[in-house]
């Protein structure tokens, strides 16, 4: 999930690449749960966002990584963006994705998927306020939102330590090859269209690890760590579109770069006390 190469390039640090086909990296021992995703297909885009709009979700000890600090570090897209829109220097960086999967289980239990049911996630890059603090393995991300289209399963995930909520999320592939996705939650409606085009990147040599921290306004306190390998991805070609409507903080975000279709990886995750 969440292809390491493109995310690293876009958000400003080196990718995790090995010289031989990569196995899924080992997670730390003693996970409280086991999350498995296989056969995923997803549409991903990247956004800058106003951190003040979600300040109440930021846990103590963490801070948002900003466009400005990435530009100061020499990240080309960030420097180019600030050249056009300098007011975005203090904004955070994030990604939004809609995912459907052949297998999606937590401790062996899967959601009751509606027709074309999918999961949606909005994740933001964060770092410790104390530069010397150790957040453990994996790129740190704040799980601003995670929506699944099964109310009982959302409760089950929260009980297991995952910061999930209910959302009416769908993702389907038309016979023409175009993907259509929708998200409908209180205060937010999202519609995305993507027709994958061009060369396929990634593949068996991609692998990485991430750590999802729950938002401060969640009843969940565990950290979710995920490890994955085998991403493939294609850029979305002509006719790609995103529509975000409503009062949700993501609606004011600024799209960064291209939208991508990603698939083919294997992911294993688990929850850990923070």
Regions found by a protein language model. Give the residues of each.
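Bacterial N-terminal signal peptides
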Residues: 4-13
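Low-complexity, intrinsically disordered short peptide segments enriched in small/polar/basic residues
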Residues: 14-15, 166
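N-terminal domain-onset segments
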Residues: 16-103, 249-250, 273-274
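Interaction-surface and assembly-scaffold signal
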Residues: 20-26, 156-274
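Short, structured coil/loop segments at alpha-helix boundaries
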Residues: 51, 56-65, 146, 150-152, ...
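A short, solvent-exposed, low-complexity linear motif enriched for acidic/polar residues
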Residues: 60, 66-69, 126, 143, ...
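Aromatic- and glycine-enriched beta-alpha-beta binding-site module
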Residues: 90-184
